[in-house]
Amino acid sequence: EDHVTYPITKSLVRRLTPLEYERLQGYPDGWTDLGEWTDTKGKVHQTSDSARYKALGNSIALPPWRFVLSRLNAYLTEHTMASLFDGIGGFPLIWQELNGSGKCLWASEIEEFPMAVTKIRFGEE
């Protein structure tokens, strides 16, 4: 035979980790790993893998949007971006990479964990 045979054991496929999901989406390592965080009602939470999976599954993949926004950025004279319902901060992250910090105004969504990710990564404003 001229091909490689891979043995199948128990017919299982390993689930990707949140870190692997972050890397596939183009986020920095640990982007959604907040440790302990506080919601808008003051309740303290510990970051769970399920919250990370959900937030990453509802986010954008950064590489194609980085390409689009870098081309758009070349034609703009004012480099401030407003990002509504941004989830875990994909668009502000790209915009900050292209233009420096403080150039994106953001508003997150209604779910507590994505709001916490964005607030921790970009500050309250």
Label the model's feature ranges.
Residues L76-E125:
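Core alpha/beta nucleotide-donor-binding catalytic domains of modification enzymes
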Residues E1-D86, G90:
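C-terminal target-recognition/interaction regions appended to catalytic cores
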